[in-house]
Structures are given as C-alpha cells and as structure tokens.
C-alpha cells in the first residue's frame, strides 16, 4: 500500500512538496515494517463555529475561520448563535465561539438566547465537547470581553474541554485572531480519538 496526494487536492506547490516528502516517509516505514493494515489519514474533523455579533465583526471572523478550516481539510459549519439550539450542543465535537460584548457586558442580540440557556439550571453536561472562545471587545469599557469570558467559564463549568485557551481581543483584533486560529488548526488536527 502506498499513500499519495490526489491530483485534485487543493494544495499549493510548497504544500504539495512538503506533503509528498511526509508521505514518502510514511510509505517507506510501512514497507519496512511489512504492515499490511490500511493506513488512514483522518480528514474532515467536524467543527461548529458559533458567532455572536452586534456590528458584524464576529460574523466576519467566523466566515474567515470557516475558509481557513475548510482549506485545512476540516468540516466546519458556521452558525449564528440564534440558530444554535442548546439541545444540539451536546452533539457538537469541536465548538469555536467567536463573540463580541455589547453595551456594558451584555451578549449581542443574536447570542442572548444561547447565553441565557447555557447559564440556566437546565443546561446539559457538555463533557463530550472540545471548545475555544475568541472574545471581541473594547478595553475602553469596564466589562471588557465579558460575554466571551462568560461563555468560556460556563462551557468549562459544564464539562467542555478547551482546545486552546480563550483569547481576548481589543479593537485591533487581526493579530490575536490570526494566532488563535493557527493554534486551533494545530489543536484540532492533533485530535485523533473522540473524548
């Protein structure tokens, strides 16, 4: 058996070159060990990107993250928090929350329902979920990134496990977003087995 990159795989020349070398190493190891088991390269890690936004910044970052994860071979889904019922949350494998904070520490309008449901006594255990939160805010406000901090705290309290630590972003969020999304790619790709 020999692993190879399909001709229609969406990689740049440099990525293709690196992957070919990587797969050549795996192929030579398989041949040397005489291992006849089929090799499986995982593809399509399911990821739900839930966004809460008052002005559109968190939504734009969610769509940007969708593209990045798709290019990396994962299976992302972008969801407005208003369209993500609490009853569906325990079935999510990887949950990425991108949310702003509105006013004086309030969740954005479209995140309010999920926020309140997660903080209710009826909130389900979420031990099967891996998650991370990107919190957008303005350090000029006393309750800087409060909504994102609250989501992070509540998901952890309900048993969800962090993929990467929470990242808080001030008005200039491009660099923190980039670092967070790069860490996520690595963390999700390294997950091989369900919880």
Regions found by a protein language model. Give the residues of each.
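Cytosolic transmitter module of two-component histidine kinases
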Residues: 51-57
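FMN-binding flavodoxin-like domain, especially the glycine-rich phosphate-binding loop
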Residues: 1-46, 56, 68-72, 91-94, ...
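A short, well-structured beta->alpha microelement
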Residues: 70-88
